[in-house]
Design a protein with these regions (language model features):
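A short, conserved structural fragment
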Residues: 58-67, 144-154
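Solvent-exposed, charged amphipathic helical/linker segments at domain boundaries
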Residues: 90-99, 145, 152-153, 160-161
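Hydrophobic, helix-prone linear segments
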Residues: 1-16, 20, 24-26, 64-65, ...
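Short, hydrophobic-biased segments on the C-terminal half of alpha helices
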Residues: 23-26, 51-55, 140-144
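N-terminal helix-turn-helix DNA-binding core of bacterial DNA-binding proteins
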Residues: 2-49, 60, 71-73, 97-135
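Basic, amphipathic "hinge/linker" alpha-helix immediately C-terminal to the N-terminal HTH DNA-binding motif
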Residues: 67-88, 157-176
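Transmembrane alpha-helices
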Residues: 39, 44, 50, 54, ...
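Amphipathic alpha-helical dimerization/coiled-coil segments
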Residues: 83-127, 171-207
């Protein structure tokens, strides 16, 4: 997926936090501190990956140790981010879907285009000048897998396919419209707070 996103954020902090496990960790710690084994069990992640993510989130001052160094809790900055993301999880959108959609260049734009009305596939793809049909098809397939959109066939000659938002897709678009600007502001604050060279970018294969 493209590293450039719908909020115009493509820096290392954005890439680091908007990954599958980082989002899941922030959301899991929203309701209170947890120890390492509890987090690993809840997330179903290996100890190696969890350790790496916890170190990086700690380096960003989003989490800190608690219980005398035996557990982890959110900092004020981490809590602010988790409070922005938590409403999506409460509506049934998983952390994995959140990061996949928000980090993608095209998925948020596609969802927003479908916000007002259903659209034919060719019409929807044509509304984005820079997207190829191959990339468009891949993104639509993913959005269907995430149960954010649905498609239906119009019995015409030739047969045409039309797309619309699922209820969960409407939840995501509503969240983007209501909280997108604030999310961008929080990430810019976080980016400014980092000293040059302080954050090591995460390799794509661990996201």
């Amino acid at each position: 997926m493209a590293s450039e996103d719908w909020l115009g954020l493509n820096g290392s902090v954005w890439r680091e936090v908007m990954c599958k496990w980082s989002v899941a960790i922030l959301v899991s710690l929203h309701d209170g501190p947890m120890n390492f084994s509890g987090l690993a069990k809840r997330l179903g992640v290996s100890n190696k990956v969890l350790s790496k993510k916890l170190r990086r989130l700690s380096g960003l001052s989003l989490i800190s140790e608690s219980y005398g160094g035996k557990g982890y809790m959110l900092t004020d900055a981490g809590l602010e981010l988790s409070q922005l993301l938590k409403p999506l999880v409460a509506e049934g959108v998983s952390p994995a879907v959140i990061q996949a959609v928000l980090r993608c260049k095209w998925m948020p734009q596609i969802l927003r285009a479908l916000w007002l009305r259903d659209m034919f596939a060719s019409e929807l793809a044509g509304s984005f000048e820079e997207i190829s049909w191959k990339v468009f098809s891949e993104r639509m397939k993913k959005l269907e897998e995430f149960q954010l959109i649905h498609r239906y066939v119009i019995p015409s000659h030739p047969v045409r396919v039309k797309y619309g938002l699922e209820a969960r897709g409407r939840v995501v678009v509503r969240w983007m419209l209501q909280r997108g600007a604030l999310l961008r502001e929080k990430f810019l604050e976080l980016q400014r707070s980092q000293r040059p060279g302080e954050l090591i970018q995460a390799p794509d294969n661990v996201l």
